[in-house]
């Protein structure tokens, strides 16, 4: 199974050509990422950060820009988790427009850290592994 959500592309997200300005793809990805925690673990991302005291800094990101997304389009994001390591999680993103055209893909690796010691890795908790299994892919 995957996490799937949609969002309209608003004017502040586009450049003068009226297409999504490239840094906004990562902004959109992060917004969908935060939303995915409600689907997988039943909690808002701020609960993970401030109550569970767990952070996930991004340590690697690769993306392919395949087709422009324009002002007013609806982007559908699909997120899967291809790998959960001891201390890291790999996230795969696919953005499609309202016509189903694949526009952007990305693979991102985040590292699990303690919010009190963000520079120190920690093991991905078992409860989190169980939650993320909902969107784990092979």
For the regions a protein language model found, what residue spans apply to each?
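Hot-dog-fold acyl-thioester-processing enzymes
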Residues: 1-59, 113-138
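Preference for bulky hydrophobic residues occupying beta-strand positions
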Residues: 7-9, 63, 79, 93, ...
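Hydrophobic beta-strand-centered segment that forms part of the acyl-chain substrate-binding groove
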Residues: 38-76, 82-83, 88, 103-105
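HotDog/MaoC-like acyl-thioester-processing domains
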Residues: 69-71, 81-138
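Generic hydrophobic/packing signal
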Residues: 14, 22-23, 30-35, 69, ...
